[in-house]
């Protein structure tokens, strides 16, 4: 058995191990959720619905075909929370935790896989970073649970209040969007404190662990990496820019929120936060303006930062594209920012990611427009919203998910998986000779007319 495991590990590349690991975790979680033990009714759950829930949990999305509060009992909800935690932090955290407890040395091959899982340039310090991520995640989620308990314990009592606080702290930090309230934060849209606590947890989880390490260690090293500078800049741009645009398109939530000016302001800010990629909602998206829906879809498509609990195209990818565009407009060929030159390979990768992921979403919209029924009161945005939500692992919905056909469910499952694992990881895992070296010769160059 040990020899067979070693052979499998040798045959699989690091990216294939990551893709396979998430896939196996989803299948395992989905199989468990079919058991009568986890449902309130005591009956078995249909495999596709269980698989959909497991995929949504592991890929920290939040889209569900079954109501989490009504269908699953406490054991089922705990299993979903566990899948969210493992999926959010990365399944490779499990062996790291066991190795740390047992005080055993981690193999070189596992270090390579960890490097790929975190999208790191080099392998030095990868174990220290993983342990740091674990500690940071635990501390933030504990603080979040305590902050949420101020709301949930008075409302639901000690036992249920503590459980709700823990579940929603984990779901918020991991940008999952699963809720036990039945209708997300819609009934609590006037609770500014709750909205701001959830917003803080979402931002903390979506910002990226490497960025947080740079921020928290700045007082010692007085240095922030280019990755963190780009991530922080784009995150601020999207949060502030999104907030201002939602103020305009939704008139500060005048038609969406029944509350005071401050309460509407908090909800407008939340509209900018939650598409990045949490899935909690405090307003009815069916009532949102078309301009607001387009902005929400854009934010869902971009998602969070690389090396975080979020999905989507990623803020750093958008940052590189914007920097390259700025360079082109100034007549330069090199992408430069913060006194550094971005590698050409990174620019090409960003362009590839943008084209491939957007094409994937367009194809998915076309497929679902054939297989699904669009209400007479809605248009193609009804399907497009769900597609971008799934790819960005967001979890916001206009109501399509519960009524998906079998093909529709499989399409959304695939989008959630690709959005979490990464399109490049999925593609490279399917290529047998993905790491084949470039030929040592070069063809003659020739220009092509553009624009």
UniProtKB/Swiss-Prot annotation:
Chief localisation class: membrane
Residue spans crossing the bilayer: 18-38, 46-66, 78-98, 133-153, 162-182, 192-212, 230-250, 293-313, 350-370, 380-400, 410-430
Gene disruption: observed consequences: Mutants are defective in potassium accumulation at high pH and lack KtrII activity. Disruption does not affect Na(+)-ATPase activity.
Molecular function GO terms recorded: potassium:chloride symporter activity
InterPro entries: Cat_transpt, TrkH
Lipid bilayer topology: Multi-pass membrane protein
PANTHER family assigned: KTR SYSTEM POTASSIUM UPTAKE PROTEIN B, TRK SYSTEM POTASSIUM UPTAKE PROTEIN TRKG-RELATED
Record-linked NCBIfam families: 2a38 (TIGR00933)
Protein name: Potassium/sodium uptake protein NtpJ
